[in-house]
Regions:
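Membrane-interface transmembrane helices that cradle and orient dolichyl/undecaprenyl
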Residues: 12, 126-131, 166-184, 216-220
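Transmembrane-helix motifs of polytopic, lipid-linked glycan transferases
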Residues: 37, 107-127, 165, 307
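Signature aromatic-anchored transmembrane alpha helix within multi-pass, membrane-resident enzymes
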Residues: 33-34, 238-240, 297, 301, ...
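Membrane-proximal lumenal/periplasmic loop motifs of glycosylation machinery
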Residues: 44-52, 68-90, 94-106, 339
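Catalytic lumenal/periplasmic loop and adjoining terminal transmembrane helix
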Residues: 196-198, 246, 386-515
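Hydrophobic, aromatic-rich transmembrane alpha-helices
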Residues: 37, 116, 120, 210-221, ...
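Hydrophobic/aromatic-rich transmembrane helices and adjacent perimembrane loops
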Residues: 149-150, 159, 201, 293-296, ...
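Membrane-interface alpha helices of multi-pass inner-membrane proteins
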Residues: 39-40, 136-137, 149, 181-197, ...
Length: 644
C-alpha cells in the first residue's frame, strides 16, 4: 500500500514541479520578448537614413555579378567573404534597386541582430543564471555597436548570432546529452562557417577547447546507459562540421594574404588586442579620454563578474567566457604581424563579455550580505551599477542616432547625397576629383551613378588625371572625417587670391567644393594639396594621405626620386595592397578596365611604396596611349626597387 501511495504521488509531484518551473519561466520569457522588441525598434529605426557605404557597395556589386560568378568567379578581395554571404545579398537585391533604398539589402542583418539577444539569454541561463542572461540580452539589444552592425549589409552580426547559437547548443549537449542538440550544434556551426571566414579563423578556434572538454566527457561516459548513442551523435556532428570546414579552408587558401610572421609576435600584443577589443565592444562614442575612462569602468565590472563567478564555483561559465575573449585576441595579435585586422571581426565576443558584465553587476548585491542593512546596501550598489551601465548604452544610442555625432561609432559618409548633388551640378565640361583616405568614393559614387558619371571623375592620385584638359569647373570631393567647421575655414583661409571656392556642399563626412575656372589640372591639384597641408593639423586627412598625394604630384613633375621618397615615407595605410592589386588584375583580364583602374588606385593608396603597383599602373597607362605617364610610373618602380 505504501508502495502504491508513493507511485501515485510521484507523477503528481513531477507535474507540480513542472508547473512551478513554467510559472518561474513565464516572467523571464515576457521580459525577453520585451527586450527583443526594443532591439527590433532600434534596428529598424533610421535604417535608410544613410546610403550604402564602401564595404556594403562592394558586397552588392559582387552579388550583382550573378550566381554563377559568385560560385565560380571570385578573385582578389571578393574571396574575403563567402559565397553564402554574397548569395544572401543577391536575394535581397531582387525586389528593389539598392541605389533607391538600402532597406532590403540591410534587412537580413537587422533580423540577425534582433534575434541575437534571445540566444544570449539562453547562454546566460545555461551559465550564470536567468537574471544574468536577461541583463546581458538587454545590453546586446541596446548596444550602439551591435545596432550599427545590425544596420550593415555585412556578415559580422551573423557571425555573432551563429557563434552564440553554436555555444548554446554545445552547452545543451553537455547538459542533456541528447542527439538533437549535437545536430543543432552542427547546423549552427556549419552555417557560421558558410557565412564568414572569420568563423573558421577566429570563432571556431575559440570554441574548440570547450568542445574538446565536452567530447572528453562524452567519451568517458560511453559505457553508461545511452552513452554509445551520444557518442555517435557527437561523431556524426563533428564529421559534418569537419566536411564544411575543409571546404571553406580550401576556399580561404585562395585569398591573397601574407602568412603571419611569428618572429614579430609578442605576448604584449595579445593584451593590446584584448584592450582594443573590449574598448570596441562597450564603445559609446564620446571623446577619447572620456571613452577610455568609461571602458575601464565597464571592464572593471566585468572583472568583478569573473571573480564572483569563481567564488560561486561557476568555473565552467567563467572559463567559457574567458576563452571566447582571450583566444580571439591571441589570434588577432598573430594575424596582425603581417595583415591588417579590424575589431569588427570579433563582434562575436560581445555576448560573452556582456555575460561577465551582467554577472559583475548582479554580484554586487551579494558581496554585502552579513546583515539586513548590508544586504540593502549591496542591492543598492547592484542597482547603481546596472543603471550606470544602461545610461552608458543609452548614451551610445544617442550618439549613434545623432547625425552630427554618430561618426565616432560608425563610418557612414553620405556618398548617396553627394552623388545626387553632383548629378545636378556637374556637366561634361567639368571635372570631379576625389581626395579621400582611403579612396573609397570612386566605387560608391559610380554605384549610385549606375556607371555613368555626370563628368569625368578621377581620384587625386590617379596618374591619368594629369593628362586631362583644363576643365570649366572642378568639384573636389573630400573626406571630412571630423565634420568640423574649423577644417573648412582653414581650407578657405589657405586658398590663394582668385581661387576661392564658388560653392561648398557639406554632407556627413564629406565635402564637395566647387572651384570655377581653375586653369590647368596639375596646378589646381597642387593648390589643393597646399590647402590640405596647411589645414591638416589636427584635422583630416592624415599625413599618410598627404604624402601619397604629394608623391603623385612630384611624379607628374618628373621628379621620380622625390616621388619614390614620399611614397616610402607614406608607408602602408592598411596591409591590403595585394588583395586590391589581384582584384585589379582580375577585372583587367575580364575586360573591365574601369574597375581595374579603381582597384589599382586603391592598391596604390594602401601601399604606395611597392614597385609592383607602379609597374602595373605603367601597363594600364601604356594601354591607354598615355606614354609619358607610363614612363614615369616605370621609373618610379625602378627607383623604389633600387632603394629597397
Amino acid at each position: 500500500m505504501a508502495s502504491s501511495t508513493i507511485n501515485t504521488l510521484k507523477p503528481t509531484a513531477n507535474r507540480s514541479t513542472a508547473r512551478a518551473a513554467r510559472a518561474a519561466l513565464t516572467p523571464a520569457l515576457l521580459a525577453l520578448a520585451g527586450i527583443v522588441m526594443v532591439g527590433a525598434v532600434l534596428r529598424f529605426n533610421c535604417l535608410d537614413c544613410y546610403g550604402l557605404w564602401y564595404d556594403e557597395v562592394s558586397s552588392v556589386q559582387v552579388a550583382q555579378r550573378g550566381v554563377v560568378a559568385i560560385l565560380t568567379d571570385r578573385f582578389g578581395w571578393m574571396r574575403v567573404q563567402t559565397p553564402l554571404h554574397y548569395l544572401l545579398v543577391w536575394l535581397s537585391l531582387k525586389p528593389l534597386d539598392p541605389t533607391t533604398s538600402a532597406v532590403l539589402v540591410r534587412l537580413p542583418s537587422v533580423l540577425a541582430g534582433l534575434l541575437t539577444p534571445a540566444v544570449v539569454y539562453g547562454l546566460g541561463r545555461e551559465t550564470f543564471g536567468r537574471a544574468q542572461g536577461l541583463l546581458a540580452a538587454l545590453f546586446v539589444a541596446v548596444s550602439a555597436v551591435h545596432v550599427s552592425h545590425s544596420q550593415d549589409a555585412r556578415p559580422y552580426v551573423f557571425l555573432a548570432l551563429f557563434t552564440a547559437l553554436s555555444v548554446y547548443c554545445l552547452l545543451m549537449c553537455e547538459r542533456t546529452g541528447e542527439r538533437r542538440w549535437w545536430f543543432a550544434f552542427a547546423a549552427a556551426t556549419a552555417a557560421n562557417l558558410l557565412m564568414t571566414y572569420h568563423a573558421l579563423t577566429l570563432a571556431t578556434p575559440a570554441i574548440a577547447p570547450y568542445l574538446l572538454w565536452v567530447l572528453y566527457k562524452v567519451w568517458r561516459g560511453r559505457d553508461a546507459e545511452g552513452g554509445r548513442v551520444r557518442l555517435w551523435g557527437a561523431a556524426l556532428s563533428l564529421a559534418a562540421i569537419g566536411a564544411v570546414g575543409v571546404v571553406m579552408l580550401a576556399d580561404i587558401l585562395g585569398v591573397p594574404r601574407v602568412p603571419p610572421d611569428l618572429s614579430l609576435f609578442s605576448p604584449a600584443s595579445v593584451g593590446d588586442q584584448l584592450g582594443r577589443m573590449l574598448n570596441r565592444l562597450g564603445q559609446v562614442g564620446v571623446e577619447r579620454e572620456a571613452e577610455k575612462t568609461l571602458q575601464w569602468f565597464v571592464a572593471g565590472v566585468a572583472f568583478l563578474g569573473v571573480l564572483f563567478g569563481v567564488r560561486e564555483r561557476r568555473f565552467r561559465a567563467v572559463t567559457l567566457c574567458l576563452l571566447m575573449l582571450v583566444v580571439p585576441a591571441l589570434l588577432m595579435a598573430v594575424l596582425r604581424t603581417t595583415n591588417s585586422v579590424f575589431q569588427r571581426y570579433v563582434l562575436f565576443t560581445m555576448p560573452f563579455y556582456f555575460l561577465l558584465l551582467a554577472n559583475g553587476i548582479l554580484a554586487a548585491r551579494l558581496l554585502l550580505r552579513a546583515t539586513w542593512k548590508w544586504k540593502q546596501a549591496g542591492r543598492a550598489m547592484s542597482g547603481a551599477l546596472g543603471a550606470g551601465a544602461l545610461v552608458l548604452f543609452g548614451l551610445g544610442l544617442y550618439v549613434y542616432f545623432s547625425p552630427e555625432q554618430h561618426k565616432q561609432l560608425s563610418f557612414l559618409p553620405d556618398y548617396r547625397g553627394a552623388a545626387r548633388y553632383l548629378t545636378e551640378r556637374a556637366g561634361p565640361g567639368d571635372l570631379i576629383v576625389l581626395l579621400e583616405e582611403p579612396p573609397q568614393g570612386m566605387q560608391v559614387l559610380d554605384f549610385y551613378w549606375h556607371g555613368t558619371p555626370p563628368a569625368p571623375t578621377f581620384d587625386g592620385i590617379d596618374p591619368r588625371l594629369h593628362a586631362q584638359p583644363a576643365p570649366r569647373n572642378i568639384y573636389w570631393v573630400m573626406t571630412y572625417a571630423l565634420n568640423d567647421p574649423k577644417y573648412l575655414e582653414a581650407l578657405r583661409n589657405a586658398s590663394p587670391p582668385g581661387h576661392n571656392f564658388a560653392s561648398v556642399a557639406e554632407f556627413d563626412r564629406l565635402l564637395v567644393l566647387e572651384e570655377n575656372n581653375p586653369g590647368d589640372v596639375l596646378p589646381s591639384l597642387r593648390r589643393m594639396a597646399d590647402r590640405m597641408t596647411a589645414a591638416n593639423p589636427p584635422f583630416s586627412p592624415s599625413l599618410q594621405a598627404l604624402f601619397t598625394l604629394q608623391g603623385s604630384l612630384m611624379q607628374a613633375r618628373g621628379d621620380t626620386q622625390e616621388a619614390a621618397s614620399l611614397y616610402r615615407t607614406a608607408g602602408p595605410f592598411y596591409l591590403l595592397g595585394d588583395e586590391y592589386l589581384t582584384t585589379a588584375e582580375g577585372f583587367h583580364t575580364r575586360g573591365d578596365r574601369s574597375a581595374a583602374w579603381r582597384e589599382a588606385i586603391m592598391s596604390l593608396f594602401l601601399e604606395p611604396y611597392r614597385p609592383q603597383i607602379h609597374t602595373y599602373l605603367a601597363q594600364l597607362l601604356n594601354e591607354e596611349a598615355l606614354s609619358p605617364q607610363s614612363a614615369l610610373e616605370q621609373q618610379v618602380a625602378r627607383d623604389l626597387e633600387f632603394r629597397n
